[in-house]
Amino acid sequence: MKTGIHPNYKTVMVKCTCGNEFESGSVKEEIRVETCSECHPFYTGRQKFAEAGGRVDRFNKKYGLK
């Protein structure tokens, strides 16, 4: 393998929309996810929706639509 061509692999914080944070390894600085094992219905056994608020939601909010 060539030296100096691979990205740096480091420990980063993974942040969920429910507020849960945990460490993982990645080449990115920060990772954001919509669901994790703390809020996913399969693991919790109950129904819960986390609102991520995407581009369409921001547009509608900005221009007072819906």
From Swiss-Prot:
GO terms for cellular component: ribonucleoprotein complex; ribosome. One of its GO terms (biological process) is translation. InterPro entries: Ribosomal_bL28/bL31-like_sf (IPR034704), Ribosomal_bL31 (IPR002150), Ribosomal_bL31_A (IPR027491), Ribosomal_bL31_sf (IPR042105). Its cofactor is Zn(2+). Zn(2+) binds at residues 16, 18, 36, 39. Pfam families: Ribosomal_L31 (PF01197). Keywords: Metal-binding, Ribonucleoprotein, Ribosomal protein, RNA-binding, rRNA-binding, Zinc. It comes from the Bacteria. GO terms for molecular function: metal ion binding; rRNA binding; structural constituent of ribosome. Part of the 50S ribosomal subunit. Belongs to the bacterial ribosomal protein bL31 family. Type A subfamily. NCBIfam families: L31 (TIGR00105), PRK00019.1 (NF000612), PRK00528.1 (NF001809). This is Large ribosomal subunit protein bL31. It comes from Priestia megaterium.
